[in-house]
């Protein structure tokens, strides 16, 4: 079983529910919702719709997984999950919670009262991603039966327990500013399908700026075996659609920074990142999207 959704609602809830059966609630990381608010979320969602919950930052950032200090906060998160009928709780620690704190993490996961909830942990920072850090994670998480959460296109998890839980933040220089290509989504599917026989299967949660479109395309691919068009437009028309969404005047550098991460389909099955098309163009300030299109025709062979 492979389940696909987004981290938060990138579109209206009604539009989201029409397409997906899963969402990771992120607002719970910043604020404890009232019982009434949580009940409203559950009531508005379809009966079989599934929520996963990102645990409040009190647990991971303020109390840094110190179990006695974090226990009350964790109980509040569990209460939210009960209202939502959520089974999975995501703990995300900051980059300052380095690998030297592995014992605190293991003690937390070993002794916190989980009840029937499944805990997954997303680490941040380079100390968890080298050989030593990954081994420490693998050893500790196997003892406490907790899945390590990563973007598997960047880094494979150190340990996967009863569930594979992947969060896709993007592969670009700047976190979140990214759109996945068809080839990358195919690779993601090949990874996910290796874990779909797990007790809870594989959960794929997109958390990049193009999360809704990427999740939609990925779900379509799983169900149909091929990808839908990005926009229905190709070549210069597809480029025009993207570059018309920014303000002018704009320098080439600002265009690359703001929208260069987007994908353009030059023709069916042929994708290129917009930054690759803009890079050969002259360094200047563009007054309009039409001026960019004129230069593209002169400098780029489409």
What are the roles of these predicted feature ranges?
Residues 1-234, 245-246, 269, 287:
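Residues lining hydrophobic/aromatic ligand-binding pockets adjacent to catalytic sites
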């Amino acid at each position: 079983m492979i389940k696909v959704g987004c981290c938060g609602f990138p579109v209206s809830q009604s539009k989201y529910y029409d397409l997906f059966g899963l969402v990771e609630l992120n607002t719970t990381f910043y604020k404890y919702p009232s019982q009434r608010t949580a009940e409203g979320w559950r009531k508005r969602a379809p009966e079989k719709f599934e929520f996963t919950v990102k645990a409040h930052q009190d647990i991971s950032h303020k109390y840094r997984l110190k179990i006695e200090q974090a226990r009350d906060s964790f109980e509040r998160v569990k209460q939210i999950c009960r209202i939502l009928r959520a089974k999975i709780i995501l703990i995300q620690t900051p980059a300052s919670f380095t690998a030297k704190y592995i014992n605190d993490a293991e003690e937390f996961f070993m002794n916190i009262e989980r009840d029937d909830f499944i805990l997954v942990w997303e680490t941040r920072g380079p100390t968890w991603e080298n050989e030593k850090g990954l081994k420490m994670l693998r050893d500790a998480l196997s003892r406490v039966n907790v899945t390590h959460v990563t973007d598997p296109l960047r880094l494979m998890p150190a340990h996967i327990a009863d569930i594979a839980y992947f969060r896709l933040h993007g592969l670009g220089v700047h976190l979140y500013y990214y759109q996945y290509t068809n080839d990358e989504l195919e690779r993601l599917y090949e990874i996910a399908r290796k874990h779909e026989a797990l007790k809870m299967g594989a959960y794929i949660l997109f958390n990049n700026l193009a999360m809704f479109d990427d999740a939609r395309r990925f779900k379509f691919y799983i169900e149909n075996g091929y990808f839908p068009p990005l926009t229905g437009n190709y070549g210069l028309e597809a480029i025009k659609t993207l570059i018309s969404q920014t303000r002018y005047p704009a320098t080439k550098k600002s265009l690359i920074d703001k929208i260069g991460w987007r994908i353009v389909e030059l023709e069916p099955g042929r994708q290129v990142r917009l930054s690759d098309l803009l890079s050969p163009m002259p360094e200047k300030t563009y007054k309009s999207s039409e001026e960019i299109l004129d230069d593209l025709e002169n400098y780029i062979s489409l």
